[in-house]
């Protein structure tokens, strides 16, 4: 089981996106496939797999999943998670037809494995938070709404030299604080785990930026539209925030391939709008 796995060990293999796989990445993917095989889902789309995994030919739903987000944090014992979403299966089931815009999602969420094991979930009618008590998931007393205003931002500042002029200008304004044109101080938070950064923003507001940049392989962003950006954006919008690639709402983008990458900026609505207008 997971508790016996060399958690941070690298397998020597790469996943469908060319990222190094860790032992727990592979195990998480296998466990999820085994669990979904017992359901009536039509197909399993995994960030770890090149192709869809067929399940039940009569199934009416598709599950898209990042089995283990933030796996670079495994050996440092920081928060990691599982991101997922559900789509209706198309009438004529081909691989091309499995590519649906995020607006078609009927449910999405993520599990966070940190100081507490928790679940954030939306069915398109708000966001609900659950905490695992060792036996079952219990609904938390938390009205999940992202504050419209924020004084926190999340970005990997080590990539500053690769950013576009717009991203550089925006972050420089935040760093200027009270002495700058924004007239107030901002704090930077960066967990290196999408689920951890998203949880924090859902809790207390903020803006998350993983923009495109000039590095090879990053020109169109780095996060996966189907497995990461769409489910996170569905949660964010349902909590009153916004999610964009800088030009379009993430949920309006029509995927052209399973492992398509996009820039992702999400969080407090006012701050996301400010970034888009800069």
Regions found by a protein language model. Give the residues of each.
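IMPase-like, lithium-sensitive Mg2+-dependent phosphomonoesterase catalytic core
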Residues: 2-4, 13-15, 23-278
């Amino acid at each position: 089981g997971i508790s016996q796995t060399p958690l941070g060990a690298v397998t020597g293999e790469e996943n469908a996106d060319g990222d190094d796989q860790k032992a727990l990445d592979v195990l998480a993917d296998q466990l999820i496939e085994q669990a979904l095989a017992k359901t009536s889902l039509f197909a399993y789309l995994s960030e770890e797999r090149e192709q869809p995994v067929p399940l039940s030919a009569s199934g009416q739903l598709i599950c898209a999943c990042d089995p283990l987000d933030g796996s670079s944090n495994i050996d440092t014992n920081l928060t990691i998670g599982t991101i997922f979403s559900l789509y209706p299966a198309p009438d004529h089931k081909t691989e091309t037809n499995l590519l649906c815009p995020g607006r078609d999602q009927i449910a999405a969420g993520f599990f966070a494995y940190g100081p507490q094991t928790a679940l954030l979930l939306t069915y398109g009618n708000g966001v609900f938070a659950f905490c695992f008590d060792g036996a079952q998931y219990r609904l938390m007393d938390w009205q999940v709404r992202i504050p419209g205003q924020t004084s926190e931002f999340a970005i990997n500042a080590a990539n500053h030299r690769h950013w576009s002029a717009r991203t550089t200008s925006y972050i420089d304004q935040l760093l200027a604080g009270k002495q700058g044109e924004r007239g107030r101080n901002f704090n930077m938070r960066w967990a290196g785990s999408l689920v951890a950064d998203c949880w924090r923003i859902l809790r207390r507001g903020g803006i998350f930026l993983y923009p495109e940049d000039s590095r090879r392989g990053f020109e169109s962003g780095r996060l996966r539209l189907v497995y990461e950006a769409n489910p996170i954006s569905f949660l964010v919008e349902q909590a009153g925030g916004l999610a964009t690639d800088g030009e379009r709402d993430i949920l309006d983008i029509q995927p052209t391939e399973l492992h398509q990458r996009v820039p992702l900026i999400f969080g407090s609505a006012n701050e996301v709008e400010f970034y888009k207008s800069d």
